[in-house]
Amino acid sequence: LSRSWLLVNAATPDVFAPALASEADSVIFDLEAAVPEEHKDAARQHVVDALSGGMTAWVRISATSTDHWQRDLEALTGLDGVRGVVLAETEEPEQVTFTAMRLRAGTPVIALLESALGIENATAVAKAPGTFRLAFGVNDFRKDVGVGEDPLAMAYARSRMVIASRVGGLPGAIDGPPGNTDGEDAVVDSSAVTASMGMTGRLVLNRDQVDWVNRAMSPSEDELAWARDLLEKHAQGAAVGDGSYLPRVLRAQKIADLADSYGLWNA
């Protein structure tokens, strides 16, 4: 389970190795928004060269409504270095399924929801064959809907994605990135909002922000101590005090599972 998903411009292959050497849990080579139209073909070839030459990464591919979608899929199919794809501008469940069908069997597809229609169809997309996780295209969503960046204004969309992920049996949703120039305090604060909404990962545009996102998205030392104490007592047969006991045990187990997936539980 990845906390940080670092997006890097596929048109500048010199950033691939530094990104993969960073603290990012996952790296995404971006063939879509970051790449100007005139550089699409060259960027696609850079990705093919990297993923057939020993590197492994996710790839953000173009929307199904574009000519580049088919070209991206043709280039990526069969490459051993493809960890999965992020499908831009997902709005319908069939878009994910059609994408998955054109890739090597078992290749995971992250559906990037970037519009009102995408959020409205979040549950159907989450349940679609081929969907691995949901991710939030925050900036494009704000442009489409006309809402501000205040957490309260974005709470409904984030909640819809979290609930849809749960209904679809998926891992927690991935939130959009902090501002590219945000400093540590701003990144930590906004990532705390992400975590409080029930999301378990976040896109990142700036490599310098990765460590801050990882820390903010991880269970705190206090949470880990509380979970260890409760789970130890539960394992020793602690008496059920009231109706809140079992929900607290489940919460503690969720913290333990998250921490274990991040390599923190036995650290």
Predicted regions and their residues:
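Expand to "…catalyze enediolate/carbanion chemistry for C-C bond making/breaking, isomerization
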Residues: 1-267
